[in-house]
Amino acid sequence: MEPGPALEHIPVMLEQALELLACRRGGVYVDGTVGGGGYSEAILRASAPDGILLGVDWDAEAIGRAAGRLSAYGRRAILTKAGFAELPEVLPRHGFAQVDGIVLDLGVSAFQIDDAARGFSFTKDGPLDMRMDPGLPQTAADMVNTLPEKDLADLIFRLGEERWSRRIARAVVERRRERPFQRTLELADTVAATVPATRDSRRIHPATRTFLALRLAVNQELESLERFLSGALDLLKTGGRLCVVSFHSLEDRMVKGQFKEWAKSCRCPREAVLCRCEGRPLVRLLTRKAVRPDEREKERNPRSRSARLRAVEKQGVPA
């Protein structure tokens, strides 16, 4: 989501997501990652004149921005500060048992990246924070300054898929013995000085994967996604649709794996002699493989380059 000169928030693959979501008038839809409100506003337009949009985000600043953007839609737009993993509790509070569609645009927003004070950027100096919700107990600085070297290396390797994780962790521990990390550029410069120059490093910043790993850990993003997916179908009406835009392989593998499991024609245990589930899949795959942004969108919006969109439709399940 590449910002323009005034911190413009550009939703990734908006047209494709809307087509897959198939909004209709009078429907109830959830934007589980409100961000700048781009998906939310598009859904409200597509479900006019009486569709309802429930938007959640655990970043209070995002909710505030979206409230201003969506004010013209009045009661059709309902916004609340919460994470998408909390939707099973949030929906009943607003009088909804199930909804017609849910969209998630995972990861960090343009506003969060471009606000140096939030601590997500490895190119702008700011406090080493990375919390999407400032109420979370642990910052990236806390992790960098306290994790044992092996644990830090494992985290960077597992969540950032960084091949140089051990070398980076060793350099971080040596540097923090002199003084603790407090600023984003302190960490970014340490990583950049540690990672060998490769063809890949000319394309992406050397600290990209380390910052990704820390952000995922600080915000427990994969845990939130797993928790959401475990109960997502219960939130949808029959025929309801779930669209997920992910930005890195760990998220996409989780979404792809869960969608594939739901789409199985038989869900009985392997040891079962006879099929008792009647061979009916829980969902219909709307995307056989991930939808990717076209070259025009990637040029207009560089942050869309790694995006993958997957979608399913909930099927009727026999009693």
From Swiss-Prot:
Region (Disordered): 292-319
Cellular component GO terms, alphabetical: cytoplasm
Main location: cytoplasm
Annotated localization: Cytoplasm
Record bears the keyword Ubl conjugation: no
Biased composition regions of type Basic and acidic residues, renumbered to the chain: 292-302
Reactions this protein catalyses: cytidine(1402) in 16S rRNA + S-adenosyl-L-methionine = N(4)-methylcytidine(1402) in 16S rRNA + S-adenosyl-L-homocysteine + H(+)
Pfam families: Methyltransf_5
Annotated EC: 2.1.1.199
NCBIfam families linked: 16S rRNA (cytosine(1402)-N(4))-methyltransferase RsmH (TIGR00006)
Function comment: Specifically methylates the N4 position of cytidine in position 1402 (C1402) of 16S rRNA.
Protein name per its UniProtKB record: Ribosomal RNA small subunit methyltransferase H
UniProt organism field: Syntrophobacter fumaroxidans (strain DSM 10017 / MPOB)
